[in-house]
Amino acid sequence: MNFSMHLVLAVAAAACLCVVTAAPEGRLTRTKQQRPTRGFKNVEMMTARGFGKRDRPHTRAELYGLDNFWEMLEAAPEREGQESTDEKTLESIPLDWFVNEMLNNPDFARSVVRKFIDLNQDGMLSSEELLRNVA
């Protein structure tokens, strides 16, 4: 072998040594902060809701409670002509809830006034309507 061939082999060996010494030792370990988990975080979020068979049956719509008292009040004109055989009617409501709804829900307050105070349904409250004696 001539001198140029030895020189090429020596340069190649030196290049391999440089590459090997510059390479990381063993397997790369992460020293940085772990990457956050993507996607859904909990089991409840991993299931579809509101889509067909997976949707929970809504039994609350059948019960009359404080949550749907306003809907029951709005539907009262349609139910006046029907005989009520429904055992789920709401007999009384808490005063604190009623006051809170009157203050925070203008649609509810408007419905209560239309249903129970504005007797002639003219959109105006007369002194007779406001001061009538409810027995």
UniProtKB/Swiss-Prot annotation:
Keyword Membrane belongs to the record: no
Signal peptide bounds: 1-22
Residue numbers bearing the Phenylalanine amide modification: F51
Single GO cellular component term: extracellular region
Domain of life: Eukaryota
InterPro entries hit by this protein: EF_Hand_1_Ca_BS
Propeptide: 55-135
Example GO biological process: neuropeptide signaling pathway
Main location: secreted
Keywords associated with the record: Amidation, Cleavage on pair of basic residues, Neuropeptide, Secreted, Signal
Subcellular location: Secreted
Tissue specificity comment: Allatotropin: Expressed in corpora cardiaca (CC), corpora allata (CA), antennal lobe (AL) and gnathal ganglion (GNG) (protein level). Expression in AL detected in all animals, expression in GNG detected in most animals and expression in CA and CC detected in few animals (at protein level). Allatotropin-PP-1: Expressed in corpora cardiaca (CC), corpora allata (CA), antennal lobe (AL) and gnathal ganglion (GNG) (at protein level). Expression in AL detected in all animals and expression in GNG, CA and CC detected in some animals (at protein level).
Keyword Secreted: yes
Stated role: Neuropeptide stimulator of juvenile hormone synthesis.
Protein name from the UniProt record: Allatotropins
Native source organism of the sequence: Agrotis ipsilon (Black cutworm moth)
